[in-house]
Curated annotation (Swiss-Prot):
Gene name per UniProt: fliT
NCBIfam families: PRK10548.1
Source organism, top-level taxon: Bacteria
Function, as annotated: Dual-function protein that regulates the transcription of class 2 flagellar operons and that also acts as an export chaperone for the filament-capping protein FliD. As a transcriptional regulator, acts as an anti-FlhDC factor; it directly binds FlhC, thus inhibiting the binding of the FlhC/FlhD complex to class 2 promoters, resulting in decreased expression of class 2 flagellar operons. As a chaperone, effects FliD transition to the membrane by preventing its premature polymerization, and by directing it to the export apparatus.
Protein name, as recorded: Flagellar protein FliT
Pfam families the record matches: FliT (PF05400)
GO biological process, one term: bacterial-type flagellum organization
Record's keyword annotation contains Oxidoreductase: no
Family designation: Belongs to the FliT family.
Keyword annotations from UniProtKB, A to Z: Bacterial flagellum biogenesis, Chaperone, Cytoplasm, Repressor, Transcription, Transcription regulation
Region (Required for homodimerization): 1-50
Entry GO terms, CC: cytosol
Quaternary structure and interacting proteins, as annotated: Homodimer. Interacts with FliD and FlhC.
Region (FliD binding): 60-98
Length: 120
């Protein structure tokens, strides 16, 4: 029974961490999300070392199934939010590259040639 409590506690910790990560992703707090992800991954690794086959209780399996479903739902939403962020960053890099090309092209001319109304 103690083993079952420990396993349930491990899954609850993962669920709590995934909920915190989802909040951070929703808020766009990417640095804190990355920091928390290390703790999350360690918790997942620790839980993976506990064998689920040792849970013979159907009630415990149902509880774990619910937690796993919620964890996976959070993972899907976090990935969606991260993809949106990646797309936004990609757009910004594209705009920056275009701006740099424009600056490089027009930077070749003397400053006075760019002023309107001046004759050369």
């Amino acid at each position: 029974m103690e083993r079952h409590q420990h396993l349930l506690s491990e899954y609850q910790q993962i669920l709590t961490l995934s909920e915190q990560m989802l909040v951070l992703a929703t808020e766009g707090n990417w640095d804190a999300l990355v920091d928390l992800e290390m703790t999350y991954l360690k918790a997942v690794e620790s839980t993976a070392n506990i064998t689920i086959s040792s849970c013979s209780s159907l009630m415990l399996q149902d509880l774990l199934r619910e937690k796993l479903r919620a964890i996976l739902d959070n993972e899907i939403e976090i990935k969606r939010l991260l993809q949106l962020r990646l797309d936004r960053l990609s757009d910004l890099v594209g705009q920056s590259t275009k701006q740099q090309a424009v600056n490089n092209t027009y930077g070749q001319f003397p400053d006075h040639a760019l002023l309107l109304g001046e004759t050369q």
